[in-house]
């Protein structure tokens, strides 16, 4: 038993009503509701197969989605939408927030993203690196790191990196 409310659940990151690629890794998130002690999220495909997935979370609001079930749901839902229903257990009982949708694109996303990771307020040449993230499973691999620890006389900066003609076959980065 639950009471339906008209408010949307507050999610971080907010994935509500967006289009996602069919091969994206599970979009785990947090629900912020100061009075709830547990959560359930029901993902229901609107594709003819009507696949579904349940995910739950405790008082911290963290919703961790099973990767195999997520992949199966997205594969079955290409070009369709998935409706997500969020339930929260409050002291007054279970409530159901307003549903939201995820539209699943038929096209896959390129699996890798490369980026330079630096500290906020970066001032010294230390702990700076180039990394590659797999967007289909969230694995991260190091391309290059200047130092794992600060060394006063042995530091160098890693500057911009780019790909020749936007192709992933050749990459260039500058170290000084």
Place the predicted regions along the sequence by residue.
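Sequence signature of WD/YWTD-type beta-propeller architectures
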Residues: 1-176
């Amino acid at each position: 038993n639950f009471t339906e409310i008209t408010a949307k659940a507050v999610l971080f990151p907010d994935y509500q009503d967006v289009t996602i690629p069919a091969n994206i890794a599970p979009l785990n998130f947090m629900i912020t509701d100061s009075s709830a002690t547990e959560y359930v999220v029901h993902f229901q495909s609107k594709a003819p197969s009507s696949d579904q997935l349940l995910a739950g979370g405790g008082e911290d609001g963290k919703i961790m989605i099973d990767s195999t079930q997520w992949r199966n749901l997205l594969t079955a839902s290409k070009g369709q939408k998935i409706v997500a229903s969020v339930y929260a257990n409050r002291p007054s009982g279970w409530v159901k927030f307003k549903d939201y949708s995820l539209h699943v694109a038929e096209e896959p996303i390129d699996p890798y993203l490369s980026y330079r990771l630096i500290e906020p307020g970066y001032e010294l040449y230390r702990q700076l690196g180039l990394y590659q993230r797999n967007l289909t499973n969230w694995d991260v691999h190091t391309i290059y790191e200047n130092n794992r620890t600060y060394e006063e006389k042995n530091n160098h900066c890693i500057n911009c990196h780019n790909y020749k003609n936007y192709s992933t076959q050749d990459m260039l980065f500058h170290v000084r």
